[in-house]
Structure formats: structure tokens, C-alpha cells
Amino acid sequence: MQETGVRNGAFGADKFGLKNLKQVHWNLGAPQLYQYSLSAGEAVLSADGALCADTGEFTGRSPKDKFTVRDATTDKKMWWAGNQSITAEQFETLYQDFLKHAEGKSLFAQDLYGGADPAYRIKTRVFTELAWHSLFIRTLLIRPEAIELSTFTPELTIIDMPSFRADPKRHGCKSENVVAIDFARKIVLIGGSYYAGEMKKSVFTTLNYYLPERGVMPMHCSANVGAKDDAAIFFGLSGTGKTTLSADPNRTLIGDDEHGWGPNGVFNFEGGCYAKCIKLSQEAEPQIYAASTRFGAVLENCVLDEDTRVVDFDDGSKTENTRSAYPLDFIPNASRTGRAPQPKNVVMLAADAFGVLPPIAKLSPAQAMYHFLSGYTAKVAGTERGLGNEPQPEFSTCFGSPFLPLDPSVYGNMLRDLIAQHNVDCWLVNTGWTGGKYGTGSRMPIKVTRALLTAALDGSLRNVEFRTDKYFGFAVPTALPGVPSEILNPVNTWKDKDEFDKTARALVGMFQKNFAKFEAQVDAEVRAAAPDVKLAAE
């Protein structure tokens, strides 16, 4: 077996059980990985120098194909209502079949950190059969210093082989595509999917499992920090604006998707960004556009002009879930440490497909826990398989249900405790629709959202007049300089006021129905933070 690159010779591929490999390329950088990827026909080069790959059938995560080993520990610890199980024996069979499938192949290995805080990071080794997947995960996680690689000993190992086909009868899964996690052995097996996002989310799921018991709350969020060390956290599902809104030229970006909040403050789990880039434009999102149109960026499922190789970001013919992966330092004002002090603001983003939530509302700590556990948004087409072309209302608890190994109340209680401990202001922001439901109304203007967020984060929104929303009970500003006052009260943007009232009451009912499963796990204060019961019943 040939091996190239810097590595820990005492802890190589054989320690993981990989044998009879043709070659292992260790910790290669972007130039070498570009070369291998292009020469193998895995990807093509854009006119701007980005590496462009197609993921084939799977253009998003496939949650139905994700499984966790159920053993004596996970049986009691895991949130099985939100996770699927396989036995230790089924996992072992799958693992051995992965090792057999790898024989004779050339693999790419990356040694990386999940987590910017040395006290809480997890040393992660990722084996991939594709060069562009190796570049992707190298871009998304945190790259150690070269001197650290010669002694790197992994805690978590991922093997990613899209050409592997699982057997549901043999392996206990549902299709030929599989993501299987064994927390006891700290091994993740990914087969059948060329969608690179499965790798990064496997690291996130692992950190979600281990960090709470160490006093760190893992979060599906973006984060940034102002000049006064005033960090802000942005919760939200894919497509709600986490990446876009945290890329603020007046604030330092900590990260765009996954963070921990603990005794030392906030820290990024990653060293890169994974931005949705459908309809990406230089005018609307200059930082993300610049980061996506240069050497070192990895583009997924973007359409290129056949002659010029110029990327057409408006073309969603392959999928609406086109993606750009790039290192954090491609953003000019990104943090070099990936860390920030205790946050001053928490923002929950919801793409409200019904068009009845206000563009911004202030939440009490109890309301914050209620809306965090509810995790309301609209699933946007393309971020997962099996969705149609229209957004669908979705309650994804903790704004990240697919990534939660533990019961949601674990994360909800941590959030409320941290908010109280650090006196954090909480906001609910609607980045979805205004002036009507999806199909009738229009998307909330990003300039309005940015203006309201700026006012919230710099403290000026605290000094304006608020009204209490009659449907949801939270506080909504009545006026703010530079923002049209009618947009602050959603009913004023609807032509049919009766239809608005009917739609708002229906959404209240949906919240109540969804939250019923959490009633027994929260106290009276959080139950009282729910939208008004009488309204839904009228």
C-alpha cells in the first residue's frame, strides 16, 4: 500500500481495519485535490476557479437512511422518537462490508478537528473515495497545524464511500443508501450518496451526543460578534437565512451553521461555510458570491455554461439545493479563532410560509424555550429528498431535529438556563413571506430583515414602542426608522383581513398541536408562553 502526505505513521489506515488498499493520500491540500478530482473526472473547473461537482440522485440529506446503533447505553440515552436504530451486529456486518469494499481502492484521508475550542473539540479522521469529498470535508472542518498531523490520533472516524451499496436485509437499513453511527466505537459509515453534506452533519450529530454532558450546548445556528464583543446566535433550518444574515460586513463572522455554547462562550464546530447558492448574486450577497467564485470553493450541483464555464447561480434545474463550500477565511471579516464571548442576543429564524408572523418579535425567556422546542419554519424545496416545489410548514424541534441524538428537552433546558445566566435578549425573525401565504405574498425583503436585526443587535430596538401580538403573545415593535411601519404588523400587508385572521388562528392551532408532546417536559411558565388557546378554539 502506497501512502503519501503528512500523517501519524503509528496510527494509520490499518488501525481502522482498512487493508489491501491501493493507495492512501493523507491530508492533501486544495491544489493536489483539485488535480486528482479533475483527472478522475469527478468534477469540472468553473471559469472562476471553483471546483464543480454533481451529486447525482442525492442532492440533499436523506434522513430516512440514517441509523444509530442501539446498545445498552444508547437505549436509555438516545431520543428514539427522532432516530432510527440498528443492532450492533448489523453495524459490524456493515462495517466489515465497508472494509471489504475499500480493498484495492485509492482513498483520501483528512485529519481534522470538530470544534474550535480545544477543551471541547473532537479529533476526526475522514476517509473518502472521492478527491472532491476530501476537499469538501477539509474545507468544512478545522484544519490542524502541520506540526500536529504527525501525532494526530483520531477519536471519531468516518468512512465515506458513495460507490458502496447497502443491503437492507443484511444491514438493517431501508435502501442502498446508508449513514450509520456507532457512538460507542465513534465510527460513522456513509455509503450510496454523493451528497457531501452527509459527512459534516455526521460530525455535528456526534458533537450533539457528547457535548451536553460536558456542559456545552450544541446548536444548529450561525454566529457573529460586534466590535463590543456582543456575540449573536442565529438559529434556523436550511434556507431560513442563517448563512446570509450572519455574513454582516459590520460584524465578525464566527460561523454559519454549527456552534457550541458553554462556559468559555460560543465556538464554531467548523472551519468553513456551506451556503445555499441558488439565485446567489453579487449585489444581494457580495461576501458569499466572492467566496463562491474563486479557487478553493467547492460547488455542488450548480449549472455551468458549456462554452464559458461561467456558473449560472439562477439555474435550479438540477436542484434548488445548490451549494457552495468555502473556507471561513474566504469571508474578509471572519473570525480567525472561531470563538467569541458569551452572547448578548439569540435570534430564531423562521421562514413562515403562511405569512402571518411579524418580521421581528421580542421573546421572553419562557417564550424563547417554547419557540426553540417548537422549531417552526417552512421546509424549503431541495434541502431534503422527497419534498415538492413548494415550502411546507414544518416543526423541527431545536431548529435541528434530524441532528438530535438526545431528547429535545435536554437542549431546551440548556438554552433557557444559558439565557437566564447571561441575561440574553431573544428575538423571533420571519424571513419567510409577507402580504399573504406562499404563492400569494412575497418573500420578506432582506433589506428589511437586515435593518431590524441591526437595530436588535446594537440595542436600539430596546427603546422603541412594542405591541403585544394578539395571536402569539410576543412583543412586536410598532415603528422603527427606515422600516415601513405597515410591514411590522403583518395584517396590514394582507388585502383580505379576514383571511389573515383565519390563517393566523390556524397557525396558532398548529403550534398547540405540535407542542402537546412537550407539555409534560416543561414547567408552567413555558406552557403559559404558548399562543392563546382560546383563539385557536374560536
Swiss-Prot record:
- At the top level of its lineage, which domain of life is listed? Bacteria
Role: Involved in the gluconeogenesis. Catalyzes the conversion of oxaloacetate (OAA) to phosphoenolpyruvate (PEP) through direct phosphoryl transfer between the nucleoside triphosphate and OAA.
Q: Which GO terms describe its cellular component?
A: cytosol
Q: Name one Pfam family in it.
A: PEPCK_ATP
Enzyme Commission number(s) from the entry: 4.1.1.49
Stretch forming the signal peptide: none
**Gene giving rise to this polypeptide:** pckA
The cofactors required by this protein are: Mn(2+)
UniProt keyword annotation of NADP present: no
Family of the protein in this entry: Belongs to the phosphoenolpyruvate carboxykinase (ATP) family.
Subcellular location(s): the record lists: Cytoplasm
MF-aspect GO terms: ATP binding; metal ion binding; phosphoenolpyruvate carboxykinase (ATP) activity
What organism does the UniProt record list as the source?
Bradyrhizobium diazoefficiens (strain JCM 10833 / BCRC 13528 / IAM 13628 / NBRC 14792 / USDA 110)
- Positions binding ATP in this chain are K201, H220, G236, L237, S238, G239, T240, G241, K242, T243, T244, E285, R323, T449
Q: How is the cofactor bound?
A: Binds 1 Mn(2+) ion per subunit.
The biological processes this protein is annotated with in GO are: gluconeogenesis
Q: Which residues bind substrate?
A: R61, Y195, K201, R323
Which InterPro entries does the record associate with it? PEP_carboxykinase_ATP, PEP_carboxykinase_C, PEP_carboxykinase_N, PEPCK_ATP_CS
Reactions the enzyme catalyzes? oxaloacetate + ATP = phosphoenolpyruvate + ADP + CO2
From the UniProt record, give the pathway where this protein acts.
Carbohydrate biosynthesis; gluconeogenesis
Keywords from the UniProt entry: ATP-binding, Cytoplasm, Decarboxylase, Gluconeogenesis, Lyase, Manganese, Metal-binding, Nucleotide-binding
Residues recorded as binding Mn(2+), renumbered to this chain, are K201, H220, D257
Record's protein name = Phosphoenolpyruvate carboxykinase (ATP)
